[in-house]
Structures are given as structure tokens and as C-alpha cells.
Amino acid sequence: METFLFTSESVNEGHPDKLCDQISDAVLDACLEQDPDSKVACETCTKTNMVMVFGEITTKATVDYEKIVRDTCRSIGFVSDDVGLDADNCKVLVNIEQQSPDIAQGVHGHLTKRPEEIGAGDQGHMFGYATDETPEFMPLSHVLATKLGARLTEVRKNGTCPWLRPDGKTQVTVEYYNENGAMVPVRVHTVVISTQHDETVTNDQIAADLKEHVIKPVIPEKYLDERTIFHLNPSGRFVIGGPHGDAGLTGRKIIIDTYGGWGAHGGGAFSGKDPTKVDRSGAYIVRQAAKSIVANGLARRCIVQVSYAIGVPEPLSVFVDTYGTGKIPDKEILKIVKENFDFRPGMIAINLDLKRGGSGRFLKTAAYGHFGRDDPDFTWEVVKPLKWEKAAN
């Protein structure tokens, strides 16, 4: 059996780039909660003792940006300088302007266009991917790396590993077998965890605790064997972390947000963007399309691409590839996709209920992945029943 290795990485919510994603989406939530028609393009950057929120926002909502920044930092665990940032005493800078009137008239006609007339907020192309290798219809390498990161945060916050600090990264290499275009995981080859820690803990205890409390509960035993390699805090020291260790920016973890290097990516980030931004809404609808194709048994693995021009409602192109795993020809599947999914941005927003913010709806997406999550707020994960005729043998 010929196999190959494929690797995916993740970072947890205390990583500076992810902190920025979460602040940007917390701002989006606050705007949409009060005004579902808010137009939001919110970027965040951070470095030692400083967070800056900037971008273009047109909204009827009253938003306390500084409070959102401090609350988000605090809930992640950035409560003192020694963990990387002090939520209550850091500098918060805000530079928010209105959406450009040129963009506003072209996309939504200053809010006068009907939903089916709303144009894409920009040009671009987005990809959706799905695979039958996990119950989530997501790549195993990505699922495991993401779950390790989430588990790191869980054992920090519940006190299981009190030496943990917010920042951390994970990486998983899986050995795969290619079964006529479908991906079959064989075993976990390598696990890397680098986590921020306090001064008191030894490297031996870090390794022991990570194996017992993080790796064991996350990675199914059947994938681990005596040859699995573990690199646990391989640098030997990771006390300085968060924005103190590295600068952070919104939109710098787009592969972690999506499919862990599988499929493809059009380059557009998600966080801090309202649904007229097709970087986000377009990527969500093609995930639903790809997942529905696989979940309905049309294919074992699938990628869907959609593309847009600014101000134009209809997509310019839709592409489907099932990597040779389709039960019917790809051109038939493409027809089914076009019949069952409305790719116009205004209709995506309605069909996936993307104008509804508040209660941390988009904030939740900003750490541990936008796809493969079992949560009713992740409306794009709902599988649509697709009608199709099995090819006669």
C-alpha cells in the first residue's frame, strides 16, 4: 500500500493573529446585533501593550470599540503583562471610517437594492472543500490539529494544567492512502505542540501533561502507534507569548480557518467582514455545496469554486471537481449545484442567515475553524438534500 504524508497546523485563541480575528468578529457581532444591514470591514493589529482597531464601518449601531477590545482580550486570558497583554491597561487605538460611497453605490445602492440585486462587495474567487474521511466531512489532519488547539485552551481555563498561558500552536502530520481519489487516513505520523507556559513548570512536566491531558483525549487511539513522533515544546522555552512575543494581524490564519492546506484557497480572509463581502459569504456557500455533495453520496471528496466581480450579483463562474470520486460525471454534479444553491451575495445572506450577529455568533468562528463545527449558528454546515439519479450500470 503506497501512502503519503500530509500536514495541517492550527493556533489557539491566544495566538496574536487569532486574537485579532476574534476582536474583528466581536466588532462585527456588535454591529449586526443592532443593525443587520451594517457594512463592516474591521481590521485589528496588536503588539506589546497595544491593540488597534481600524477599517470601514457604516452602521446605525452604537458600538463601544474599546470595551469590545478589552472584553475579548480578557475572555481569552490576557489579564496581565506577564502572559503577553493586560486587557485592562493596554492602549486601545480606534481608527474607523465609513464605507467608501463609491463601493456603497455599486454594491447595495446605498441600501436601496433588493436582496437579489445586491452585488458582490469585491471581485475574487472562493473555494469550498469536503471529504468523507471524518464525520465532519473535513480533513483529519486539520480536524486533529484544530481539536488539539481547542483542548489546550480547555485545560488552561478549567485549571487542569495551571502552568499554561494563552498562546499556543499545534501541528499534525497524517499518513494517508489514496483510494481512487478519496483520502483514507492510516495513522498519525507526527504531533507538534508549542504552548506558552509560566516560569514554574519543567519541560518534562510540559511533555507529560500535554500527552496525558491534550493528546490522549483528542487523537483516537487507533491512529497512534509506537512510531508516532512527538515534538512537545521543541524550542525548550516559550514563556513570552501573545502580542508581547509576536505582532498580530486580522486575516493572517486563513488556512487554519478553512481546510488546513487541503483543497484550495482564493486568498480572502473572513473575520471582521459582513456578508456583502464575498470573501466570507462566498466561501461559506461553497462549503455548504461541497459538503452537501459528499454527504448526499454524490462523491467521496469534492472541491467547489465560485468567482465574482464587484457590483455584480451573479457569480462569474462555478467549478466542481470530485477528484475522480464522483458517482456521476462532474458536469452533472455542477448542474445539481447550480440548481440547488443561489450564489448571489444578497441571497446567500438570507439563506444562511448571515445578517444575524450578537451572542458571539461570528466571534465563535474566529478561533478553531469556520468549517466542520457542530453548532446551529454555523448555518453553512447544514447539509442540503440533493436529488440525483444514480447512473445505470
Swiss-Prot record:
Pfam families documented for this protein: S-AdoMet_synt_C, S-AdoMet_synt_M, S-AdoMet_synt_N
Cofactor names: Mn(2+); Mg(2+); Co(2+); K(+)
Cofactor note: Binds 2 divalent ions per subunit. The metal ions interact primarily with the substrate. Can utilize magnesium, manganese or cobalt (in vitro).
Tissue: Mostly expressed in roots, and, to a lower extent, in hypocotyls and cotyledons.
Keyword Magnesium: yes
Keyword terms of this UniProt record: ATP-binding, Cobalt, Cytoplasm, Magnesium, Manganese, Metal-binding, Nucleotide-binding, One-carbon metabolism, Potassium, Transferase
Residue numbers binding L-methionine: E56, Q99, D246, K277
Enzyme Commission number: 2.5.1.6
Segments crossing the lipid bilayer: none
Activity regulation annotation text: Inhibited by products of SAMS reaction (SAM, Pi, PPi), substrate analogs (cycloleucine and ethionine), and alternative nucleotides (GTP, CTP and ADP). Strongly repressed by PPPi.
Binding site for ATP: H15, D167, G168, K169, S235, G236, R237, F238, D246, R252, K253, A269, K273, K277
Thermal behavior of activity: Optimum temperature is 37-45 degrees Celsius.
Chief place where the protein resides: cytoplasm
An example Gene Ontology biological process: one-carbon metabolic process
MF GO annotations: ATP binding; metal ion binding; methionine adenosyltransferase activity
CDD domains per record: S-AdoMet_synt
Catalyzed reaction equations: L-methionine + ATP + H2O = S-adenosyl-L-methionine + phosphate + diphosphate
InterPro entries listed in its UniProt record: ADOMET_SYNTHASE_CS, S-AdoMet_synt_C, S-AdoMet_synt_central, S-AdoMet_synt_N, S-AdoMet_synthetase, S-AdoMet_synthetase_sfam
Keyword NAD found: no
GO cellular component: cytoplasm
Function: Catalyzes the formation of S-adenosylmethionine from methionine and ATP. The reaction comprises two steps that are both catalyzed by the same enzyme: formation of S-adenosylmethionine (AdoMet) and triphosphate, and subsequent hydrolysis of the triphosphate.
PANTHER family per the UniProt record, alphabetical: S-ADENOSYLMETHIONINE SYNTHETASE
Similarity annotation: Belongs to the AdoMet synthase family.
Protein name: S-adenosylmethionine synthase 1
